[in-house]
């Protein structure tokens, strides 16, 4: 174990924690929780189920936020006690435990520090992530599947539940497209920096001549709507198509037309769902995602940020945000933040927190510069 100046490190932890406390405004947080708790305890709360759901959901999010902060404060105090005992008794095991806990707290504070930067209108929401294969043929489809696994592994590492909502398999290998939900507070604010075009450079395993291939995939992230969001879509604006669910290689995995495709005629936004067991369930899931996309579309139109609209991301040379190079060298590099990592296997296994953190800070700096 390397020599660690625990006194200096603990002072740094406390300084970072106090900075987060000031930004969070603990007094306002506790007042918000008290007010929401009072409203949640009203006997007529569930007379309006949609409003009740919003209140209880926000209360849960705010309580989790307070718990994260208070737990970290306790862990810093406990670390200080552990270090004192270890040093007084010359206990190498205790000091090793203290070093591991120091690293763990530093990481937790860093993650919490990034969360304080998430102040967008929908940043607290759960997220729906869609991945589409772009230019590059079968390599692009394979890349889309690699990205899907990367994000699902990232969510798994954080203990975030996920639900795969739709998968459209390519003929030879990989995915044409996929959609999944990440069920965690701030999932949208966190993952929205991943939206854009991703590029893969490697020796193609599908090329008999072993040539280097460049392929692309587009990632879209939208906030999941809540029941109280005002998004009404007239029936005459939606075209409904039903078809049989398909698996790898285009084979049918269902004997009934349970898969559903919804097209919003005025905007051209298309949503497909096939992973639920019934057509009714797929239609309900597709409608919720369609409403979510239109909600974000409306906000982005109001903000005149049309570049990020659903369907506007072209999975080709333009608008690249990250490159994954596996040959002639190994490097994953974010083209916006310049953050790069040489361990490509770890990245594809879901270790992307540093990319996300850098992306959130980059976005915050850009927003502040525009003010």
Swiss-Prot record:
This is Peptide chain release factor 2. Peptide chain release factor 2 directs the termination of translation in response to the peptide chain termination codons UGA and UAA. SMART domains: PCRF. The gene is prfB. Signal peptide: none annotated. Belongs to the prokaryotic/mitochondrial release factor family. InterPro entries: PCRF, Pep_chain_release_fac_I, Pep_chain_release_fac_I_sf, PrfB. PANTHER family: CLASS I PEPTIDE CHAIN RELEASE FACTOR (PTHR43116:SF3), PEPTIDE CHAIN RELEASE FACTOR 2 (PTHR43116). PROSITE patterns: RF_PROK_I (PS00745).
């Amino acid at each position: 174990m390397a020599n660690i100046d625990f006194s200096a490190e603990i002072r740094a932890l406390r300084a970072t924690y106090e900075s987060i406390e000031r930004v969070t405004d603990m007094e306002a947080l506790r007042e918000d929780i008290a007010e929401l708790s009072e409203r949640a305890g009203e006997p007529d709360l569930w007379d309006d189920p949609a409003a009740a759901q919003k209140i209880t959901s926000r209360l849960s999010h705010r309580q989790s936020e307070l718990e994260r902060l208070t737990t970290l404060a306790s862990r810093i105090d406990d670390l200080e006690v552990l270090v004192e005992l270890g040093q007084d008794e010359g206990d190498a095991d205790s000091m090793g435990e203290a070093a591991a806990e120091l690293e763990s707290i530093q990481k937790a504070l860093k993650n919490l520090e990034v969360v304080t930067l998430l102040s967008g209108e929908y940043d607290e929401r759960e997220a729906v992530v869609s991945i589409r294969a772009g230019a590059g043929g079968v390599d692009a489809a394979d890349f889309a599947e690699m990205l899907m696994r990367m994000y699902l592994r990232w969510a798994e590492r954080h203990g975030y539940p996920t639900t795969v909502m739709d998968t459209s398999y390519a003929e030879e290998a990989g995915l044409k497209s996929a959609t999944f939900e990440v069920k965690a507070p701030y999932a949208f604010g966190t993952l929205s920096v991943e939206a854009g075009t991703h590029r893969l450079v490697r020796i193609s395993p599908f090329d008999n001549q072993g040539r280097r291939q460049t392929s692309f995939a587009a990632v879209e992230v939208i906030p999941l709507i809540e029941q109280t969001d005002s998004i009404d879509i007239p029936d005459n604006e939606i075209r409904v198509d039903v078809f049989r669910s398909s698996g790898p290689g285009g084979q049918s995995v269902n004997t009934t037309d349970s898969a559903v495709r919804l097209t919003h005629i005025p905007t051209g936004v298309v949503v497909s769902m096939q992973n639920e067991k019934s057509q009714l369930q797929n239609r309900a899931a597709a409608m919720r995602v369609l409403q979510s996309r239109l909600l974000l579309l409306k906000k982005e139109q109001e903000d005149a940020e049309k570049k990020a609209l659903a369907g506007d991301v072209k999975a080709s040379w333009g608008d690249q945000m990250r490159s994954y190079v596996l040959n002639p060298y190994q490097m994953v590099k974010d083209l916006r933040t310049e953050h790069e990592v040489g361990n490509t296997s770890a990245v594809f296994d879901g270790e992307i927190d540093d990319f996300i953190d850098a992306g959130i800070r980059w976005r915050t700096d850009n927003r502040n510069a525009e003010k």
